[in-house]
Design a protein with these regions (language model features):
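Helix-coil boundary and N-terminal low-complexity module in membrane systems
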Residues: 1-136, 140-142, 169-303
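Alpha-helical transmembrane segments of multi-pass membrane proteins
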Residues: 155-167
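Juxtamembrane helix-entry segments on the extracytoplasmic side of multipass membrane proteins
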Residues: 147-155
Length: 303
């Protein structure tokens, strides 16, 4: 059961009775503290689904084999697409204040959109694999000639990766939405880009920085990927796009109903006990992750 089920109907941590919805970094911290359990669970599933793509594409790029890169990218993309849809749906669930259990919602989303997700993942991963192959080929050819690739080539490759990140982020954001009328995926993504280009580019930059950094540091980044690698940039990117999704597609946000006032006022000891329980409801996930990080660092330090 989601941690939010226990909180639905309660006052949130640091939220006053007449306080408006939190914005920016405060809202991000509120979602992380409230839904870290489902974020970590989704992150683990995304890691498992993306692992074949990471291994297959890296093998083709390392061997500088274009046929192997194309085949591995296209085949493993059938898993990468659903993974990105799960990630976006998980972030949207937190942004919507949805108190439902996260795993049944993830199953419903995949059941409704798995065909489109597989197609989106196949094409996106294929383009990513080709870009990685071209980058590796350019650097290898330059190294054999004894010089470094020029600035124009680096800028061109960086822009290609940025365009791919923006389009992939927008497609992943609009794919899980339940729309009254069917529409093509690229048209929905283009609509967001036309309405708020700055937000769309920023969301793509966040995803590129988070996931692209893991790709560059793979396999060293495996530990980071399992804990934070996908949900952290994914939640930040979806939060950036969420105002546009609310405006263009009417994505609803559930308000948290205030509980009925108690029959008699709480004593100071009861208020302290309730406050302590409320803090643990919101922050148990952060404490668990901090403990995992400390144990991991201690294990690596002492060999």
């Amino acid at each position: 059961m989601s941690i939010y089920n226990a909180l639905y109907g309660r006052d949130g941590h640091g939220v006053g009775p007449n306080e408006p919805e939190k914005k920016g970094f405060a809202r991000f911290c509120q979602m992380v503290g409230r839904d870290l359990g489902q974020l970590l669970g989704t992150n683990l599933m995304v890691c498992v689904l993306c692992l074949p793509a990471a291994l297959g594409v890296s093998l083709g790029v390392t061997l500088l084999s274009l046929p192997l890169t194309v085949v591995c990218s296209a085949v493993t993309g059938l898993l990468t697409g659903p993974a990105m849809v799960l990630l976006a749906d998980c972030a949207l669930r937190s942004l919507q204040n949805d108190p439902s259990q996260w795993l049944p919602r993830a199953k419903q989303t995949l059941a409704a959109h798995w065909k489109a997700a597989c197609g989106f993942g196949c094409i996106g991963t294929l383009v990513l694999g080709l870009l990685c192959f071209v980058s590796a080929f350019v650097f290898e050819a330059a190294a054999q000639q004894g010089y470094y690739p020029g600035l124009a080539i680096l800028v061109f490759l960086a822009l290609d990766f940025l365009v791919l990140a923006v389009l992939a982020t927008l497609c992943a954001a609009v794919l899980p939405l339940q729309l009254p009328a069917p529409d093509s995926l690229l048209r929905r993504a283009g609509r967001l880009l036309a309405v708020a280009p700055a937000r769309c580019v920023l969301a793509g930059v966040l995803m590129l920085a988070g996931i692209g950094g893991m790709i560059l540091l793979f396999p060293v980044s495996v530990f980071w990927a399992v804990l934070f690698g996908f949900w952290l940039p994914g939640l930040a990117a979806m939060q950036t796009l969420f105002p546009v999704l609310r405006q263009e597609y009417g994505v609803e946000v559930r308000s948290i109903p205030r509980p009925a006032a108690p029959d008699k006022p709480l004593t100071a000891q009861e208020q302290k006990k309730r406050s302590r329980a409320n803090w643990w409801y919101y922050n148990w996930g952060i404490v668990a992750v901090a403990a995992m990080v400390i144990v991991g660092v201690a294990y690596v330090a002492h060999g």
